[in-house]
Amino acid sequence: MKVNLPAFERAGVMVVGDVMLDRYWYGPTCRISPEAPVPVVKVNTVEERPGGAANVAMNIASLGANARLVGLTGIDDAARALSKTLAEVNVKCDFVSVPTHPTITKLRVLSRNQQLIRLDFEEGFEGVDPQPLHERINQALGSIGALVLSDYAKGALTSVQTMISLARQAGVPVLIDPKGTDFERYRGATLLTPNLSEFEAVAGKCKSEDELVERGMKLIADYDLSALLVTRSEQGMTLLQPNKAPLHMPTQAQEVYDVTGAGDTVIGVLAATLAAGNTLEEACYFANAAAGVVVGKLGTSTVSPIELENAVRGRADTGFGVMTEEELRQAVASARKRGEKVVMTNGVFDILHAGHVSYLANARKLGDRLIVAVNSDASTKRLKGESRPVNPLEQRMIVLGALESVDWIVSFEEDTPQRLIAGILPDLLVKGGDYKPEEIAGSEEVWANGGEVMVLNFEDGCSTTNIIKKIQTESEK
């Protein structure tokens, strides 16, 4: 079923708030330091990702919406890294440079899929003149459909009331991811998106959903809000609006690896969906689905339109789906960061039979994720003859995607998937039949990358060709 996503390409969103750079150092841990009882990490991979308000803007841009980012930075390598990375994903940056302060940076050291320590490099921007931020907001109000204020209490949003007033006067909704217990600062906002802990720190501990709703409605009245969305981790999220019944949405997360940046994803998808012209209820629906995807990834991350589409169909990227090559490469990269072993196989899979099902189940048991590469219709004709395939590519991929053993499906146009395999480089390449490992397309590339190649047996008596012959014979009787 095709899911109608919002018209993100028509949506314009400005994000104003605390901009930061998230750095990740990865490496193996093999010993304890002789200097202190701490592990020694041999760093072999370094990543830099936009965090805080910058991650919100990334999430908006990843959906195909027009994202503008305003915030405070220093004049340093971190600011340059942020600008470069954000420009690459089409986020329009308009930073206010403060030469007396460093750009806020958070460094995480990870090993064996565990975060060992986080180091923060920052000085609060409190006291910095907010007027340049106000000017940037004023200039953009005529071309945006939503304003996001991303508050991490680092000093960029000391004049929240002025920012809310500017936007509301222009008829632009204001969405705020709050910080701290002083919700008076956010009076008059269109929507606040606290998590449950943040909400209860202001409203008090809630023993039931009824109590949460009652206290949430009181907050809406006390602070003149248009709506309140409480994100509740494994309990999903709850939308509260005056004169409307509460909307409780269960979580769609299938696997949770890291909640870092999940709130950024939620408010980013909310803003982009509202700016595209959808209702708040629809925006919450898409945001809930996106949150279920992003918590299955390690570190601050974003959600693509195809991932969102799969998620609202109940098929999040952490599990299954038909993908393009680029989407598959991203999914494999995320899986590897989680320490998962990726297995890949290929074939026509024209009329799926018990032999195919058994073979794919056995291949899946050899790792954590199974990719199935499928010959296109043209490729199948060249390989099998003009009468094939019996089932077109789209139908073959849909049937494969229904198997529990199959995680990702991708098609290829060539006679063999050698180019595709060389681009993915699975940990294990599997082929069924009487092949020798060295005869399998892509084997040399996989071996050169340190991977494995294996041949599995097909179930005796199962053959698409035999099935077709039997059908033809029966029809001739």
From Swiss-Prot:
EC class name: transferase
Keyword check for Magnesium: no
Disulphide linkage map: none
GO biological process, any: ADP-L-glycero-beta-D-manno-heptose biosynthetic process
Region of interest called Cytidylyltransferase, as start-end residue ranges on this chain: 344-477
Source organism, top-level taxon: Bacteria
Active site positions, chain numbering: D264
Pathway the protein contributes to: Nucleotide-sugar biosynthesis; ADP-L-glycero-beta-D-manno-heptose biosynthesis; ADP-L-glycero-beta-D-manno-heptose from D-glycero-beta-D-manno-heptose 7-phosphate: step 1/4; Nucleotide-sugar biosynthesis; ADP-L-glycero-beta-D-manno-heptose biosynthesis; ADP-L-glycero-beta-D-manno-heptose from D-glycero-beta-D-manno-heptose 7-phosphate: step 3/4
Keyword Cell membrane: no
Assigned keywords, A-Z: ATP-binding, Carbohydrate metabolism, Kinase, Multifunctional enzyme, Nucleotide-binding, Nucleotidyltransferase, Transferase
PROSITE patterns: PFKB_KINASES_1 (PS00583)
NCBIfam families for this protein: cyt_tran_rel, PRK11316.1, rfaE_dom_I, rfaE_dom_II
Family named by the database record: In the N-terminal section; belongs to the carbohydrate kinase PfkB family. In the C-terminal section; belongs to the cytidylyltransferase family.
Protein name, per record: Bifunctional protein HldE
Organism this protein belongs to: Salmonella paratyphi A (strain AKU_12601)
Gene (name only): hldE
